[in-house]
UniProtKB/Swiss-Prot annotation:
Keywords: Chloroplast, Lyase, Magnesium, Manganese, Metal-binding, Plastid, Transit peptide. Binds 3 Mg(2+) or Mn(2+) ions per subunit. It comes from Arabidopsis thaliana (Mouse-ear cress). PANTHER family: OS04G0344100 PROTEIN-RELATED (PTHR31225), TERPENOID SYNTHASE 9 (PTHR31225:SF242). The gene is TPS20. Pathway: Secondary metabolite biosynthesis; terpenoid biosynthesis. This is Bifunctional dolabella-3,7-dien-18-ol synthase/dolathalia-3,7,11-triene synthase TPS20, chloroplastic. One of its GO terms (biological process) is diterpenoid biosynthetic process. CDD domains: Terpene_cyclase_plant_C1.
Length: 592
């Protein structure tokens, strides 16, 4: 479960910085590159403990984690149910007006509106309508693009179709090239077009060279545009997109940012803006209620008085993670299920990584495999943790039993056991000083990335996820496998330094250095190259997958949650990385 639980630092990346005022929509982000070079060292050769040590307990791999973001600011907030009900009525009234717009517009205008609905976080209200329109419109897309020379428009059309799994050819961008293959100089005069073209490049696959070129070309010039003579709100929007593209960012964060940007656009649609603001406030109040539920559950669990303080308490951070997977209000129960699971997975991951001895890790894994509350051969605190974990799943069963979906929880339990078996292998490597080669490491690492388990638990609270959805995960489809690899790579880069500090020398970076005889710097550069390559594979498999779009999107969003939390460091361990985003969702309620 490392892909959601560890820390590290990442050189040569954009970092999030700026004021954290509660009066702003989201903290300003600015561009800053690390000046710290990678040390040119080779592999650490031995861990500090041995499987035969007589002093296992004395040599626990203790590690001091930073505190949670959950403080009095979050504990004091509340949501008024009457306000939620009132906002719900307003949403229904405005929804009808927006739906009319979708029907009455011509094809190109409608696609631009769909792009706005997605960016503002309200497209989920019209998903069936949108899918039906785009299915028909895609058949006539060549006529739609004929003679179109506006880069912004072409990029928006490209992004919308690809988002809804229609693979519009990237050849549409050839019109923006000179005969010598360079992009036309006149494109630099269209800042919004350049930004949209940059966003479009994130939908590329490994066979689309023009989108690789577009990403480099547009990013280079967008960085120059920031702080230039452009409008302040446009510069701020560019900063946000350069920090995380819409394709990488959590939808809920992207929507919050885009609403602020759109409000300051001169020609914004007042009805659409009002609808987006009311809808976002409606969602925020649901999130506040969910946080209250999770905090209440955590306090009643009272693990802090029952087990040693070796772990991270990450209630608000785990809910933020779940919100990145699905933001819609109708998935409140699903978010709570996923959040509670994430909270306990994090503690169990810390048990394996940062506290238990090897005999304890073996006993814990064997008892989890039996799935019985009368655990044997374990310290009392581990028995308490195991009972809490099993009891949580009994709660989940009660939640889904009336829907006839007990299989969803049973499948989730199987995924947990699979993960714990692989976690034990990592523990053995760490405690015995074994450094596998990279290929051997990845066989374990793609499981401990936790993607399969996270997708499975994300489906538990979704009534529309039937048995076939879980069978799909069990079949280990290539789409999920590529997400596994991407999650593993992101985690390995972000958590490397902390893992080494804990004596976990069998890290992805270290194993790669060992197998290929390269320096740390070279290993990091290769991992970044592989992340980019794997992101394109994810896109390719997204287009190929025949599972219902809603379910594929949830799995895809698990990958976005990885990007949101790990692209610029370990946001789950070091909450300051994502504090601005979390603050903007829970504490800075949007003003209507």
């Amino acid at each position: 479960m490392e892909a959601i639980t560890k820390n590290g630092s990442l050189s040569q990346t954009l970092v999030h910085c700026g004021p954290k005022s509660l009066s702003s929509f989201i903290p300003v982000r600015c561009l800053r590159f690390s000046k710290n070079p990678f040390p040119k060292k080779l592999v650490v050769t031995r861990a500090r403990t041995s499987i035969n040590s007589d002093h296992e307990a004395a040599n626990r791999p203790l590690f001091q984690f930073p505190p949670s973001l959950l403080d009095d600011r979050f504990l004091s907030i509340s949501a008024n149910q009457s306000e939620i009900d009132s906002l719900g009525r307003d949403i229904e009234a405005l929804k009808a007006k927006v739906s009319e717009k979708l029907v009455c517009m011509d094809v190109k205008e409608r696609i631009h509106l769909i792009h706005l609905l997605v960016s503002l976080g309200v497209a989920y209200h019209f998903e069936k309508q949108i899918e039906e329109f785009l299915k028909v419109d895609f058949e006539n897309v060549e006529d739609m693009n004929l003679g179109e020379e506006d880069m912004y428009s072409i990029s928006v059309i490209f992004r919308v179709f690809r988002l809804y799994r229609h693979k519009l050819s990237s050849d549409v961008f050839n019109r923006f090239k000179e005969e010598n293959g360079d992009f036309k100089k006149c494109l630099l005069d269209d800042v919004r077009g350049m930004l949209s073209f940059y966003e479009a490049s994130y939908f590329g696959t490994n066979t689309e060279e023009i989108l690789d070129e577009a990403m480099g070309f547009t990013r280079k010039h967008l960085e120059l545009f920031v702080g230039g003579s452009n409008e302040e709100h446009l510069s701020g929007h560019i900063k946000n997109v350069l920090y995380l593209s819409q394709q990488e960012n959590a939808e809920v964060v992207m929507s919050r940012e885009y609403i602020q940007f759109y409000e300051q656009e001169t020609h914004h649609d007042e009805t659409l803006l009002k609808f987006a603001k009311i809808n976002f406030k409606f969602m925020q109040l649901h999130y506040v209620q969910e946080l209250q539920t999770i905090v209440k559950w955590w306090k009643e669990l009272d693990l802090e008085s029952k087990i040693p303080n070796y772990y991270r308490v990450r209630a608000v951070e785990c809910l933020y993670w779940a919100m990145a997977v699905y933001m819609e209000p109708q998935y409140s129960v699903a978010r709570i299920i996923l959040s509670k699971s994430l909270v306990l997975w994090t503690i169990i991951d810390d048990l394996y990584d940062a506290y238990c001895t090897l005999p304890e890790a073996i006993a814990f894994t064997e008892n989890m495999e039996r799935w019985e509350t009368d655990a044997k051969d374990m310290p009392d605190h581990m028995k308490v943790l195991m009972r809490s974990f099993i009891d949580l799943h009994e709660d989940f069963k009660r939640e889904v039993i009336l829907e006839g979906r007990l299989y969803s929880v049973e499948y989730g339990i199987d995924e947990c056991k699979r993960l714990f078996r692989e976690d034990l292998k990592l523990s053995k490597w760490a405690r015995t000083g074994y450094i596998p080669n990279y290929d051997e490491y990845m066989e374990v690492g793609i499981v401990t990335a936790g993607i399969d388990m996270t997708v499975a638990f994300a489906f538990i609270g979704m009534g529309e996820a039937g048995k076939e959805a879980f069978d799909w995960i069990r079949s280990r489809p290539k789409f999920i496998q590529t997400l596994d690899i991407k999650g593993r790579l992101r985690d390995d880069v972000a958590t490397y330094k902390d893992e080494m500090a804990r004596g976990e020398i069998a890290t992805g970076i270290n194993c790669y250095m060992k197998q290929y005889k390269v320096t740390e710097e070279e290993a990091f550069l290769e991992f970044h190259r592989r992340i980019k390559h794997t992101s394109k594979l994810v896109n390719e498999e997204y287009f190929k997958t025949t599972v219902p779009l809603k379910l594929v999107r949830i799995a895809f969003n698990v990958g976005r949650a990885i990007d949101t939390n790990y692209k610029h460091g370990d946001g789950l361990t070091y909450g300051g990385i994502v504090e601005g985003q979390i603050t903007s969702l829970f504490l800075d309620l949007i003003t209507i």
